[in-house]
Amino acid sequence: LPPMAQGKDKACFAVTEPNTGLNTTQLKTRAVRKGDRYVVNGQKVWISTAQVANKILLLARTTPLDEVKRPTEGLSLFYTDFDRSRITVREIDKMGRKIVDSNELFFVDFEVPVDDRIGEEGKGFEYILHGMNPERVLIAAEAVGLGKLALSRATAYAKDRVVFNRPIGQNQAIQHPLAENWMELEAAWLMVLSAASQYDKGLPCGAAANAAKYLAGEAGYKACQQAVMTHGG
């Protein structure tokens, strides 16, 4: 952690895969132990900051799904060097959120020392759960912030854009969708605050964190979409 806090190390978090999404137990990326190392092969997607990372926090399956009693078992977590000779990084072009790069990662015989495994083998899913709920709250807060920024730009444009001798913002067809966006963003923000409060108090917050992420994502997306349409007026 000290090198991360000092800015000497930059890390990316690699969990999501093309065909699994939130169904983390179905990850296909394999880490096969060979002596004092694991050999990793597979693919990840929507991985942030991989363009600049020199470290990677990686979740991979070390025991095949058909060999475990529960699907949450057999996943292991690693924190290791980002070897670009074994990891191909392909950036995903996005319409927004350009400040953070999003990427596809392709692992071909990527070697990870056993010492770079976090905790016990097969307990990775259990470990990441401790960080997933606060991450969901943070993502939800980000979505609300993006939506509010889009809304502020849309309303400013609606006040300045003059058509037929008056600002387009004086038309109810422009006003009502933006007002609806504002209400949805405010409601999502209250859900974010509720989830964050539950987490800070040490209470179970899984449902609230997921609800906040969903509501904020929907509200943020709709606000951005409406902002684009407003600028077309």
Regions found by a protein language model. Give the residues of each.
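Flexible, small-/acidic-enriched active-site or ligand-binding loops
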Residues: 26, 83-113
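A short, Trp-centered hydrophobic/proline-enriched beta-strand micro-motif
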Residues: 7-15, 59
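Short beta-strand-to-turn element immediately C-terminal to the catalytic PLP-Schiff-base lysine
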Residues: 32, 58-62, 79-81, 106-108, ...
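A short core secondary-structure module
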Residues: 37, 41-90
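Short glycine/proline-enriched turns and hinge-like loops at secondary-structure junctions
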Residues: 23-25, 49-54, 69-73, 98-100, ...
